[in-house]
Amino acid sequence: MISRKEFENLVEQALGELPPRFADLLQNIAVIVEDEPSDSDLDALADRGHELLGIYRGTPMTKRRHNIVAMLPDQIAIFRGPILRVTRNRGEAVRQIRDTVIHELGHYFGLDDEGMAY
């Protein structure tokens, strides 16, 4: 079992491993850990047969208007409970956390699910 603190550290580690060319583009975004997705998060899930591992809440970079000055930060939530349920050991959990962080950042950059390998 991975504690919440260790899980948060693994999310931070995944962010720290981003190539600088992508990390430098992250602006006005918060990456947080939540235990479970909310009902409204689940409503956004197209395939109810799978666990929701993370979600991007915001406006993708490709759809932003550049004249907006004061925007609330976008948010990526990584869901601890679902990730721990779909993985069998610590190594799998670490890989899934990394893959989920990368996937949700893909949405931030404007990619849809079909356009991502993760």
Regions found by a protein language model. Give the residues of each.
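Catalytic glutamate of the conserved HExxH
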Residues: T100, E104-Y108
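Active-site rim/adjacent substrate-binding subdomains
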Residues: M1-Q96, Y108-Y118
